[in-house]
Swiss-Prot record:
Subcellular location: Periplasm
Subunit structure: The complex is composed of two ATP-binding proteins (UgpC), two transmembrane proteins (UgpA and UgpE) and a solute-binding protein (UgpB).
Main location: periplasm
One record GO biological process: transmembrane transport
The species this protein was found in: Pectobacterium atrosepticum (strain SCRI 1043 / ATCC BAA-672) (Erwinia carotovora subsp. atroseptica)
Keywords, in A-Z order: Periplasm, Signal, Transport
PROSITE patterns assigned to the protein according to its UniProt record, in alphabetical order: SBP_BACTERIAL_1
Annotated SUPFAM superfamilies: Periplasmic binding protein-like II
Gene: ugpB
PANTHER family linked to this entry: ARABINOSE-BINDING PROTEIN-RELATED, SN-GLYCEROL-3-PHOSPHATE-BINDING PERIPLASMIC PROTEIN UGPB
Described function: Part of the ABC transporter complex UgpBAEC involved in sn-glycerol-3-phosphate (G3P) import. Binds G3P.
UniProt signal peptide: 1-30
Entry's family note: Belongs to the bacterial solute-binding protein 1 family.
Name of the protein in its database record: sn-glycerol-3-phosphate-binding periplasmic protein UgpB
GO CC aspect terms: cell envelope; periplasmic space
Length: 444
């Protein structure tokens, strides 16, 4: 009798445990995983994970799963390959020069349609116009992707090195002519490297051109048609590359690589100045062991009307096609979460990327962040310096990642002395135009 009672009690407990486990399993299965492939590493990756964790705590039916997939080129290639294989992520972070490629593909679901289908009345006007305009479809007037980590290049400089060289640590060079003078003085004061810069196409061609009121290509840099032609081999751009070549020969400008290698050389104290993404601020803040400042990009003192306005870099979030309704609803909720003023402001403040919404910018001002962190508003001020001209609002060129590679190759031939600046830019334009024609044909 006693043994029977024990057996019955054990059976009841076992059954109860099974029911509980089944309920837990059902609850776990109810949450829809939403893969989010990105290119944010280091401190930036930590912030992406933090945003996802906060969202996931507020939403039990969906789970954002951030996955680092390498740099921008690697992530885009991985996303395209995954789509072709039928296992693309729900959200893919794509850098700004991939915009034309994504627009022309059949792999995406426009973000405005994602909101509409999810029944979320999302106001696209919350985004800063100069940011959202980059990702807006000219025909519908709606966003194709959602701005996320938008940036402009800024000048980072070592204040301690400036003091040692007898330079005012509160006055970074404003023009490229001053840059040449400052780097010579910094080198004379013992700095191994006066100035370094990566992302040559974005900084030394695209943003140099916009900042000095010049087009990179016809058809307003491709916004008005795929039959655009590159034209960055004009006298002002050639003169700029010549100045850098002269600095390079003297040892005042050092080329370390195509991506973020110069940023590391800066925060390690080897280089006195670098032009890099405003989004590099998080890593510089984490690693620099010296006093540093943030200044605007230098401009050409001889360029009429300069400085004009900077054009954005960074990336936006694209929603991939072929997903179910539950996934798209979760994606829409996450996009809405990212655009909330408190979340967009925190992302801006912790990373150095631009405040992508007007409310985030106003909240950051109200919190006194810019007063406590001088220079943190430089990227925004550059972007809003003057109303953009038709050809300084951004770039929308097909095969742009490949064109940037061409620019890298041609400028590297200048730094090694194999070509003159004019020869290199002429070749870059010729090779780039061939890539544009190939893209134009593919869209017909």
């Amino acid at each position: 009798m006693f043994n029977n009672t024990i057996r019955k009690t054990h059976a009841i407990r076992t059954a109860a445990a099974c029911v509980a486990f089944a309920l837990m399993s059902a609850g776990a299965q109810a949450a829809t995983d939403i893969p989010f492939w990105h290119s944010m590493e280091g401190e930036l990756g930590k912030e992406v994970n933090s945003l996802a964790d906060r969202f996931n705590k507020e939403h039990t039916d969906v789970k954002i799963v951030p996955v680092y997939k390498g740099n921008y080129e690697q992530n885009l290639a991985a996303g395209i390959a995954a789509y072709r294989a039928g296992n693309a992520p729900a959200i893919l972070q794509v850098y700004e020069v991939g915009t034309a490629t994504m627009m022309a593909s059949k792999a995406i679901k426009p973000v405005y349609e994602v909101f509409k289908d999810a029944g979320i009345n999302f106001d696209e006007s919350v985004f800063v116009p100069t940011v959202s305009g980059y990702y807006t479809d000219a025909k519908s007037g709606h966003l194709l992707s959602q701005p996320f980590n938008s940036s402009t290049p800024v000048l980072y400089y070592n204040k301690d090195a400036f003091k040692k060289a007898g330079l005012d640590p509160e006055q970074p060079p404003k023009t490229w002519q001053q840059m040449a003078d400052y780097t010579a003085k910094l080198r004379s004061a013992g700095m191994k490297c006066g100035y370094a810069s990566g992302w040559q196409g974005w900084i030394q061609i695209e943003n140099f051109s916009a900042w000095n009121g010049l087009p990179v290509a016809t058809k307003n840099n491709g916004f008005d048609g795929t039959d655009t032609v590159l034209e960055f081999n004009k006298p002002t751009q050639v003169k700029h590359i010549q100045l850098l070549q002269d600095m390079n020969k003297k040892g005042d400008f050092t080329y370390f690589g195509r991506k973020d290698e110069p940023t590391e050389k800066f925060y390690n104290g080897e280089c006195a100045m670098t032009t890099a993404s405003s989004g590099s601020l998080a890593n510089i803040r984490e690693h620099a062991k010296f006093n540093y400042g943030v200044g605007m990009m230098p401009y050409d003192a001889d360029a009429k009307g300069a400085p004009q306005n900077a054009i954005i870099g960074g990336a936006s979030l694209w929603v991939m096609g072929g997903k179910d309704a539950a996934t798209y609803k979760g994606v829409a909720e996450f996009m809405q979460f990212l655009a909330k003023p408190e979340n967009a402001a925190e992302w801006h403040q912790k990373t150095g990327y631009l405040p992508i919404t007007t409310a985030a910018y106003e909240l950051t001002q109200k919190q006194g962040f810019y007063e406590k962190n001088p220079g943190a508003d430089i990227a925004t001020r550059q972007m809003l310096n003057k109303p953009p001209l038709p050809f300084t609002k951004g770039m929308r060129l097909g095969n742009m990642p490949q064109i940037r590679t061409v620019v890298d190759e041609e400028l590297e031939s200048v730094w090694t002395g194999k070509k003159t600046p004019q020869q290199a830019l002429d070749s870059a334009v010729e090779r780039g135009n061939a890539l544009l024609r190939r893209f134009e044909q593919s869209t017909k």
